[in-house]
Amino acid sequence: MVKRVMLCMAVALMGMTANAQTNSNHLMFGVGALYEKGLEATIAYEHGSKYHNAWEYFATGYLQYDDDPNAGHVTKKSFWHNYNSWHLGIAYKPCVNRGRNHHGNVRIGASGGSDLHDFVGGVHLGYEHTYALKGGWELFFQVKEDVIIGSGLRWRTGGSVGLKLPL
Protein backbone atom coordinates (compact mmCIF):
# COMPACT_ATOMS: atom_id res chain seq x y z
CA MET A 1 0.00 0.00 0.00
CA VAL A 2 2.78 2.45 0.93
CA LYS A 3 4.61 1.62 -2.29
CA ARG A 4 1.51 2.40 -4.36
CA VAL A 5 1.03 5.76 -2.62
CA MET A 6 4.71 6.64 -3.13
CA LEU A 7 4.50 5.63 -6.79
CA CYS A 8 1.37 7.77 -7.32
CA MET A 9 3.07 10.75 -5.65
CA ALA A 10 6.20 10.33 -7.78
CA VAL A 11 4.15 10.19 -10.99
CA ALA A 12 2.15 13.27 -9.94
CA LEU A 13 5.34 15.21 -9.14
CA MET A 14 6.89 14.31 -12.50
CA GLY A 15 3.78 15.58 -14.26
CA MET A 16 3.89 18.89 -12.38
CA THR A 17 7.55 19.57 -13.15
CA ALA A 18 7.05 18.77 -16.83
CA ASN A 19 4.61 21.70 -17.14
CA ALA A 20 6.62 24.21 -15.11
CA GLN A 21 7.29 26.66 -17.97
CA THR A 22 4.21 26.12 -20.11
CA ASN A 23 1.95 29.17 -20.60
CA SER A 24 4.10 31.46 -18.47
CA ASN A 25 3.75 35.24 -18.67
CA HIS A 26 6.58 37.73 -18.22
CA LEU A 27 7.13 41.45 -18.07
CA MET A 28 10.29 42.24 -20.06
CA PHE A 29 12.70 45.17 -19.71
CA GLY A 30 15.58 45.52 -22.17
CA VAL A 31 18.16 48.03 -23.38
CA GLY A 32 20.37 47.82 -26.44
CA ALA A 33 22.68 49.44 -28.93
CA LEU A 34 22.11 49.52 -32.68
CA TYR A 35 24.30 50.42 -35.63
CA GLU A 36 24.94 53.29 -36.30
CA LYS A 37 24.95 55.41 -33.13
CA GLY A 38 21.60 54.18 -31.87
CA LEU A 39 20.23 53.23 -28.46
CA GLU A 40 16.90 51.66 -27.58
CA ALA A 41 14.83 50.72 -24.55
CA THR A 42 11.99 48.19 -24.65
CA ILE A 43 9.22 47.19 -22.27
CA ALA A 44 7.14 44.18 -23.26
CA TYR A 45 4.57 41.64 -22.13
CA GLU A 46 5.40 38.07 -23.15
CA HIS A 47 2.82 35.29 -23.17
CA GLY A 48 4.42 31.87 -23.39
CA SER A 49 2.70 28.97 -25.10
CA LYS A 50 3.61 25.32 -25.55
CA TYR A 51 7.23 24.24 -26.09
CA HIS A 52 8.74 27.67 -25.21
CA ASN A 53 7.01 29.42 -28.13
CA ALA A 54 5.77 32.90 -27.18
CA TRP A 55 3.91 36.03 -28.23
CA GLU A 56 5.42 39.39 -27.34
CA TYR A 57 3.58 42.73 -27.19
CA PHE A 58 6.14 45.52 -26.99
CA ALA A 59 6.75 49.26 -26.79
CA THR A 60 10.16 50.50 -27.94
CA GLY A 61 11.82 53.88 -27.77
CA TYR A 62 14.75 54.51 -30.14
CA LEU A 63 17.31 57.31 -29.98
CA GLN A 64 19.99 58.01 -32.58
CA TYR A 65 22.70 60.43 -31.49
CA ASP A 66 25.29 62.27 -33.58
CA ASP A 67 28.27 64.61 -33.23
CA ASP A 68 27.48 68.29 -32.75
CA PRO A 69 28.84 70.07 -35.88
CA ASN A 70 29.88 73.12 -33.82
CA ALA A 71 31.58 71.26 -30.97
CA GLY A 72 33.00 68.32 -32.97
CA HIS A 73 31.81 65.74 -30.41
CA VAL A 74 28.57 64.45 -28.88
CA THR A 75 26.84 67.07 -26.74
CA LYS A 76 23.67 66.91 -24.65
CA LYS A 77 21.65 68.52 -27.45
CA SER A 78 23.07 66.32 -30.24
CA PHE A 79 22.49 63.23 -28.07
CA TRP A 80 18.84 63.83 -27.11
CA HIS A 81 17.54 65.83 -30.09
CA ASN A 82 19.04 64.22 -33.21
CA TYR A 83 16.47 61.50 -34.09
CA ASN A 84 13.88 59.83 -31.83
CA SER A 85 11.14 57.31 -32.56
CA TRP A 86 8.79 55.01 -30.71
CA HIS A 87 7.01 51.85 -31.79
CA LEU A 88 4.18 49.63 -30.53
CA GLY A 89 4.16 46.13 -31.94
CA ILE A 90 3.73 42.39 -31.73
CA ALA A 91 6.21 39.56 -32.32
CA TYR A 92 5.86 35.79 -32.55
CA LYS A 93 8.78 33.82 -31.14
CA PRO A 94 8.96 30.14 -32.13
CA CYS A 95 11.50 28.10 -30.17
CA VAL A 96 14.41 26.77 -32.24
CA ASN A 97 16.85 25.72 -29.51
CA ARG A 98 16.13 24.16 -26.13
CA GLY A 99 18.39 22.99 -23.34
CA ARG A 100 18.68 22.76 -19.60
CA ASN A 101 17.78 26.18 -18.12
CA HIS A 102 17.93 27.98 -21.48
CA HIS A 103 16.12 28.23 -24.81
CA GLY A 104 16.46 30.19 -28.05
CA ASN A 105 13.71 31.75 -30.15
CA VAL A 106 13.53 33.36 -33.57
CA ARG A 107 11.73 36.70 -33.22
CA ILE A 108 9.43 37.75 -36.09
CA GLY A 109 7.28 40.84 -35.71
CA ALA A 110 5.79 44.09 -36.94
CA SER A 111 5.27 47.49 -35.36
CA GLY A 112 3.95 50.97 -35.94
CA GLY A 113 4.79 54.26 -34.34
CA SER A 114 6.12 57.75 -34.89
CA ASP A 115 9.40 59.59 -35.29
CA LEU A 116 7.75 62.67 -33.71
CA HIS A 117 6.90 64.00 -37.19
CA ASP A 118 5.49 61.17 -39.32
CA PHE A 119 4.11 57.64 -39.00
CA VAL A 120 6.74 54.90 -39.25
CA GLY A 121 6.28 51.15 -39.52
CA GLY A 122 8.72 48.38 -38.82
CA VAL A 123 9.38 44.75 -39.67
CA HIS A 124 11.49 42.95 -37.06
CA LEU A 125 13.55 39.77 -37.36
CA GLY A 126 16.02 38.46 -34.83
CA TYR A 127 17.14 35.81 -32.38
CA GLU A 128 16.56 35.80 -28.63
CA HIS A 129 18.34 33.50 -26.19
CA THR A 130 16.92 33.21 -22.67
CA TYR A 131 18.52 31.81 -19.51
CA ALA A 132 16.36 30.78 -16.52
CA LEU A 133 17.35 32.28 -13.16
CA LYS A 134 16.03 31.68 -9.64
CA GLY A 135 12.51 32.70 -8.70
CA GLY A 136 11.16 32.52 -12.26
CA TRP A 137 13.30 35.45 -13.45
CA GLU A 138 14.99 35.12 -16.83
CA LEU A 139 17.93 36.86 -18.51
CA PHE A 140 17.72 37.37 -22.27
CA PHE A 141 20.02 38.45 -25.09
CA GLN A 142 18.67 39.57 -28.47
CA VAL A 143 20.26 40.06 -31.86
CA LYS A 144 17.91 42.08 -34.03
CA GLU A 145 17.42 43.34 -37.56
CA ASP A 146 14.77 46.01 -38.09
CA VAL A 147 13.55 47.40 -41.41
CA ILE A 148 11.85 50.76 -40.81
CA ILE A 149 9.37 52.11 -43.35
CA GLY A 150 8.53 55.81 -43.54
CA SER A 151 11.66 57.40 -42.09
CA GLY A 152 15.07 58.43 -43.37
CA LEU A 153 16.60 55.56 -41.40
CA ARG A 154 15.74 52.33 -43.21
CA TRP A 155 17.82 49.58 -41.57
CA ARG A 156 18.76 48.96 -37.95
CA THR A 157 20.92 46.13 -36.67
CA GLY A 158 22.19 45.52 -33.17
CA GLY A 159 21.69 43.74 -29.91
CA SER A 160 20.04 44.12 -26.54
CA VAL A 161 20.05 42.56 -23.09
CA GLY A 162 17.36 42.49 -20.43
CA LEU A 163 15.36 40.76 -17.73
CA LYS A 164 12.04 38.92 -17.77
CA LEU A 165 10.04 39.17 -14.56
CA PRO A 166 7.40 36.49 -13.90
CA LEU A 167 3.76 37.56 -13.59
Feature locations, PLM:
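Cleavable N-terminal export/targeting peptides
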Residues: 1-24, 167
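Short loop/turn motifs that connect adjacent beta-strands in outer-membrane beta-barrel proteins
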Residues: 20-24, 50-54, 96-104, 117, ...
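Short glycine/proline- and aromatic-enriched beta-strand/turn motifs that initiate or cap beta-hairpins
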Residues: 20-65, 69, 164-166
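Flexible, solvent-exposed loop segments that connect beta-strands
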Residues: 22-24, 55-84, 104-106, 112-116
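Residues that define the transmembrane beta-barrel architecture of outer-membrane proteins
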Residues: 23-25, 37-41, 82-88, 102, ...
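Membrane-embedded beta-strand positions of outer-membrane beta-barrel proteins
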Residues: 27-31, 43, 55-59, 88-90, ...
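Residue-level signature of outer-membrane beta-barrel architecture
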Residues: 33, 47, 92-96, 129-131, ...
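Outer-membrane beta-barrel "beta-signal"
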Residues: 154-167
